[in-house]
Amino acid sequence: MLKAMTLTRHGASLRLSARALAAVLGIAVLAGCGLIGRQGGPQDPRDAVQGSTQARERQWARTAWRYVENNTDGERGLVNGMDRSPTVTVSNMADALAATIAARELGIIEAREFDLRMSRLLGFLGSMDLSEGRLPNKAYHAGTGKMINFEGRPADIGWSAVDIGRLLLWLKIAGQRHSQFQEYADKAVVRWNFCEVIDNCGVLRGSGRAAGGQSFRYQEGRLGYEQLAGAGYAAWGFQARASAELPATEAVNIYGLPVRYDARDARATGVPTPVLTMPFVLMGMELGWDRPGTREMADQVFRIQEERWKRERQVTARTDWQSREAPYVVLDSVFAAGYPWNTLGADGKEYDKLALVSTRAAFGMWALRPGEYADRLIETVQHLYDPDRGWFEGRLEASGAPQTNLTLATNAAVLEALLYKAKGRLYAREDRPGYFQAQTADPFLRLNRCLPNERAACEAAPAAAAAPVAPPGR
């Protein structure tokens, strides 16, 4: 077993481009619920402490919102995925919805601004060009709204099934929490063709372009982000068992504690299987860990990082993050390629010096798991921001230096954590009849887009446990 792990650690099978890796793997009204103090001032010292906490959290939310303000296209409502860079992924669109909803419910923006921002973004989602005429492209230009590749050139580069699942969940949340937008969220989804992105059992398929321009399909998703994406499809009525439920896992002991990881062999698939914090944070805040086994997995991931702090006095909040320099996508892992605390790049190489105390992972664990370690996490990251631009990615473990890159994923996650802390779970398992239901309820009305009412029942065992098919060259 150790030999196999070493091969995984040093072999070339993990070598993916940053963009390919991202594609395959795939983040309360203040006055009423805890961020704005009561009128009339504090009545005793405990109220004074609470008021100070509320003011602090309000400032945190405003700082995160500054990123969105600075990076929004005024015509389409798209928000740059990285500061001052107009590339927008489908996952970024979900982050923009999350950030905007959180800002409104936390009292950071007024109703009119909220309406304008949501209307523009949903208007774009309901009319944007689609990859192969089927589904959202992996990337768009914020300024033009056109499909692009990750170098910023016009191109149809295929879709990410994981990113689409993330967007589906937030479109459903938007319609649930703000019913005036449900019709428009529904209309965006109804126009998509789901025939090749998810099968009848819930296996997710991304698409890409080979060097010669040919389109290809590949099984997409690994433990964590795959389940989060599957929940997005399930929210719209798709049978998503193969992706929403946990795949086959194996366990490794770290400090005598078990940590489960995806059993799919990265050497055979070319796709790494890191254990990361953020997918379990998002599953907790958005879904309440409602799928069997997800709460236990999250507890393992959170607890082992706290244990590292107790034993080694190393504050730890590990997750994936983005850099402006190579390797661009960093898989800062609890466990990966056979080793604990392994930091990998998109090229499969180790980047130990890029190990990070992630701002968004720290905020997420703080919101979900209050306690001494949560307080230490916040103490570590609470000043990692530019008041005019937003929150930084985090603090380097080795030196303590701030990693000053600014991204939508991190700033949206801060807002989402504050909203969760104020109001609890963000997605309710209840469906209000609307446009989507009207279009899919009639068995004689078939749009031929493989919507839930147009599908056969799942008859096979979940295919996610089988060996996935990696895209060529990955």
Report the location of each language-model feature.
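C-terminal, flexible cofactor-proximal segment of oxidoreductases
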Residues: 1
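Ser/Thr/Asn(+Pro)-rich, low-complexity disordered segments
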Residues: 34-474
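Bacterial N-terminal signal peptides that target proteins for export
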Residues: 4-22
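Bacterial N-terminal signal peptides
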Residues: 20-32
